[in-house]
């Protein structure tokens, strides 16, 4: 049961003030003036709609890192509202933020908010998503083209295991949001593997089978229903750009009375791992949010303390970057998620899936 006192605080303050307030990252603030110049760092997270990772993982990991370093920080979530994210950026500046970890919602608002933060005297670290061509000082994320390559190689391995590789399988793609630079990089990655196979006839692309979904699983389900209809229910494998879209494909297959096909995923969600154990999903790309959050927090803390930013290992679109390596998770190595504390057995190995955990 949640602590009633914490709920009350969350309703009134709407912030996570590291070291000072234990509240959710998604509520509203009522009187920011009272906390003016009270923070050194700020985190602007994008939403709770397309992924639960921001509330379940990013916010608590970042909160812990800033608290350990003794750096007061404000963590906010825009709930997929660009205007709200802009207001939150203004709030961060009003409260004295010297550095902002910024995960944009879309390129247009992302560039505008970055300009706002920089003009207000804050250094910007693009977190997870890069605002291309912006004034950000650093970028922290995973190797996104490699994420896409892992997906493509994952479903290819599954097709070989099912002995349908070499039989001209029909393959579809459910992409993320065309406005999301990460989604475009994921697609760049899996297309670099799949397009040569489409071109030489090894695979056949499903009719109407390359669609953008806005990271919306409901829309993804509707689109995949249409893809099945256009292809006489004969789709042999599919890219799903995250576990939510994989779930949309799986629900569509079940509704049509069809058997499992190779399906990719991303984010290593409890449901995604359960589908992997049950044989409905081939795998999921695991990106250690803990490592990403800790790397980003370390960069922000270094800036606040006037020290050299650790871990810089490249440049992306002219921005100094800290790029991390993703992992493809299957039935063979899913326990890595438990070992690293990303998921708990109690989240996955329950109900009908308990007997599948070995």
Residue ranges and their predicted role:
Residues 2-6, 27-358:
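A residue-level marker of the well-folded mature domains of exported/periplasmic proteins
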């Amino acid at each position: 049961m949640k602590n009633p006192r914490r709920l009350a605080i969350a309703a009134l303050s709407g912030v996570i003030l590291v070291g000072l307030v234990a509240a959710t990252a998604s509520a509203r603030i009522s009187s920011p003036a009272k906390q003016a110049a009270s923070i050194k760092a700020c985190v602007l997270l994008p939403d709770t709609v397309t992924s639960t990772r921001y509330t379940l993982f990013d916010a608590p990991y970042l909160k812990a890192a800033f608290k350990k370093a003794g750096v007061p920080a404000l963590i906010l979530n825009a709930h997929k509202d660009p205007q709200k994210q802009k207001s939150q950026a203004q709030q961060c500046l009003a409260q004295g933020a010297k550095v902002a970890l910024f995960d944009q919602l879309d390129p247009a608002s992302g560039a505008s908010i970055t300009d706002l933060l920089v003009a207000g005297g804050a250094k910007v670290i693009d977190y997870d998503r890069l605002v291309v061509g912006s004034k950000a000082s650093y970028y922290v994320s995973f190797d996104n083209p490699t994420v896409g390559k892992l997906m493509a190689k994952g479903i290819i391995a599954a097709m070989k295991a099912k002995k349908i590789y070499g039989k001209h399988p029909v393959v579809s793609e459910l992409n993320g949001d065309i406005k999301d630079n990460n989604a475009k990089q994921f697609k760049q990655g899996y297309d670099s593997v799949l397009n040569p196979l489409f071109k030489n006839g090894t695979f056949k692309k499903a009719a109407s089978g390359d669609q953008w979904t806005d990271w919306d699983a409901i829309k993804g389900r509707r689109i995949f229903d249409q893809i099945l209809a256009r292809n006489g229910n004969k789709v042999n494998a599919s890219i799903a750009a995250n576990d939510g879209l994989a779930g949309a494909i799986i629900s569509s297959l079940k509704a049509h009375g069809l058997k499992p096909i190779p399906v990719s995923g991303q984010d290593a969600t409890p449901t995604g791992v359960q589908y992997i154990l049950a044989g409905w999903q081939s795998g999921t790309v695991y990106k250690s949010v803990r490592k990403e959050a800790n790397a980003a927090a370390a960069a922000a803390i270094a800036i606040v303390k006037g020290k050299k930013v650790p871990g810089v290992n490249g440049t992306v679109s002219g921005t100094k970057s800290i790029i991390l390596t993703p992992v493809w998770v299957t039935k063979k190595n899913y326990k890595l998620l438990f070992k690293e504390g990303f998921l708990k057995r109690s989240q996955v190995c329950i109900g009908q899936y308990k007997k599948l955990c070995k």
